[in-house]
Amino acid sequence: DMMPHCADKLKNHYEITYLGHGWESIVTRMKDAGYDVAQITFATDYIEEVRKHDVQFTPIAIGTGTKGKVLDALSNGLLVVGTPFALENIAVENGVSCVEYHSNEELLAALTDIPHHVEKYEVMAEKGREAIFREHGRKRISQQLIDLFK
């Protein structure tokens, strides 16, 4: 609900794409508020679609059902802006390799800052990508699994 009300601060800096079903009413509200918004209800190649974007918002409030999508975004070089639940147990650090927010005010501050400091956030996204390959890579995880049986 926050973004339609903050349109004047953000709408000229972002093109927003919603992936998946169930976003229709929010897409309409965002368009009515002046945002450039699209919805892709089904992507035949999810990873290819993710790679077309720069930032992924992960406002997960409870549960871990989309944790894989957070890892997909990070490993493909997107800046992830998410809640503590979204980033829980992922080897990233707030302000270094991702942006973690705890309130709508923190989210708005980050979204307002990103267009004015693009290079800073590009570096952050790259550090997130590197962290995922280093800490969550197949080789490291499989070695840890093998070590359990030694």
Regions found by a protein language model. Give the residues of each.
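Conserved catalytic-core segment of nucleotide-activated headgroup transferases in glycan assembly
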Residues: D1-A33, Q39-K52
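A structural motif in glycosyltransferase catalytic domains
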Residues: D1-M3, I16, A73, L107, ...
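Cofactor-binding loop segments of dinucleotide-utilizing enzymes, especially the Rossmann-like FAD-
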Residues: H21, T83, S103
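Acidic donor-binding loop of glycosyltransferase active sites
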Residues: R51-G65, N76-L78
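Short hydrophobic beta-strand element within catalytic cores of glycosyltransferases
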Residues: K69-D72, L79-T83
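Short acidic/histidine- and often glycine-rich active-site loop of Leloir-type glycosyltransferases
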Residues: P84-E100
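Conserved acidic donor-binding segment of nucleotide-sugar-dependent glycosyltransferases
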Residues: S97-E105, D113-V118
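A charged, aromatic-enriched C-terminal amphipathic alpha-helix characteristic of glycosyltransferases
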Residues: E119-F149
